[in-house]
Amino acid sequence: MDRLERLVIRHTLRLPSPAGPAGEGDVAARQFDAALMSVGFKLSADALRTLSGLSEGTVVDTAVRTLATVRELAGDHVRHNVYFVDFPANVPDTFEFWMRCVTEALEDRKARPGIIAQLRTGVINLLTLPSYGNYRHTYDEMLAAHDELTAAVGDRLTVLHLGGPLGDEVTALYLALAGSTTPLGDEHLADLGVLAEHCADGPQPVEIPVRENRAVVNAARLKAGSLPLLDTVTDVLRLACALSDGDVSLQEPTRFRKLSRLVRRALLAGLDDVVAQAPAKLADVLLHREAFKRLGERLHPHEYPRWPHAAEVFAVARGEQKAHSFDGRVEALFGADDVTGAARLLASAPGKLFRSLDRLLRSAATQEERDAVVAAVERVAPEVSGRVVLSVREYLHNRAEETGRKRVFINRAGRAHVTDDTRHAVPEEERKRLMAALDAETARRLPSPERLLVDPDVLDVALPLSGRATAAGLGVLPRGSLSPVDGELLRFFVYWKQKQRVTDYDLSALLLDARYDTVSWLSYTNLRDVEGEHSGDITNAPDGASEFIDLRLGAVRGMYIVPQVNIYSGERFEEAEESFFGFMLREAEQKGQPFEPRTVRMKSELRGPGRVALPLAFRRAEDGSWQAKWLHLYLKGEPEHNRVEGNQVTVATLLRGIVEREQLTVGYLTELMANAGTEVATWDAASVPQEPVTYIGLERPEGLHPDSVVITPENLRDLIPE
């Protein structure tokens, strides 16, 4: 049950109500609260009150489990050492430091011959210098070199609110994730799998709209002896991927495991039933022909003649049977320049119509055809998922400005690339008509609370139209979001622990001006500059390693700061035993250790593809303040030796494409609700309403009526209308 409790706390920042005998636990509860505050967390008043009425043993057990969970959330579950023992003080000039390493190597009897040989060639490999890349002191020695952190008003204090009994909290979390209207990230999908197995015999969501989520739930249902929920052949393919711990999004090939006879029968029966009810769905096989071929090798459909329709699936995959695809019919109409016919046919598949909208508008040669396209969209909009409606609305909003510029493509795994935009412009009048229609459709679906309280800081948070546009962690917001940054010192950190091979990750920060040209950078090749310091290069992490960059925001030249993690050598982010990135904010006079959990504002896992990670960027506003712009991007990079110097042009181009693209935000939805008659008011913590309200903010405030509807980043997906 400890694992389930950790999931609830991580996802909801709610502490399940502990089960235990009554007692006098007030002293232990206060000590628990104090321990939480040392790592940037705090018990809500209700949680503290409830714990105080339980036995001391119950409180202590709860504290031990909870502290372990929140320390991991903040990145405090590992030891963060630094190369330069008193970082950020006394960081040397880069050349001075390298010369010192060479001098020490020449004084080393073992290293001396090799260094002299390298000096004769004029090139020295830093990794051959004994004092380079490895810690020269213990963790305890590093701690002794730093003053204690002085508390400040700006330190993070994340409140843990009291939840219900653990069983109720687990069920609620399962229903929320399974019924999400947006795809979940890989970490949340894995959590859904754990919850689905635990909740297989309990309440189930009325609907599971996202296919990837359905696959994970189906895998749990099958293991529990229940029938899977299937209505397309692709549902069966995704289920097979889930059972093999593969990619349920079908973006990457899955190596199918040997399946038991029971599972093979269930999958074949599912395929047979889907095709028997709707033979046209055989066309979906063509989209994933190779995957179905590989699945057929595991299912042995020839051994089960009672399911002949299942055999047809694999016959289509092998090319032995024809299946006329819907997409083929659409292409034939486009080929005949019949835009009206294409729009009419696509209207029978509303999602495909919305995804083909740009092409339809560009292909329409007459006003009659353009009117037909708009009319088709208006007619079927109520049948399209809210996520797709909002995605197309955002796309149309940016379409006019993007024409002729660079296009940024980001796949579902977060890998990004840039290309020229060679598309023709779409008709402006129709673009505006469609935007108005989608606004009206979204407004129709939104709730209509009498009163909505909004934290102003949440208005610039991008709508989570895909869970894959974010990452698991603390304080993480969806890609494209803007959030305020307050503090004199901005400190980045990366931690990694290699699994099998020597692995070297390099933390860097690129500084760009208003035109996205390079001003400077901080990395192991430039340890110190006007803006700040680098903690030193660590090149091997068998027991884990950390690197830091300290920046004085007031001294930063330029407009943008782009931290990045480059894989210089070794294991990919997905291969390492553990890897995460984050940033801290503090005032100069606070001092403290290089890593102080209560100053951590954001910590996220590094688990994407590619060899260069770009978690977020920081930009200076016109008034001189700073904001974080959330990216969650990965660049393919080079197989080895990735450095900030080698990717600065690509990073600048990507950043420009994202910064100049306007996202649909929470502010967009609240404006629609206000226009529909909801009273929207700015949250004022000084006057908490007594009656139930709907609240949207970055954190759940204390004192709200228990029947209030509360939306925070942890459940922001609930804001997306179905």
Q: Model-derived features: where do they sit?
A:
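Intrinsic-disorder/low-complexity signal
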Residues: 1-722
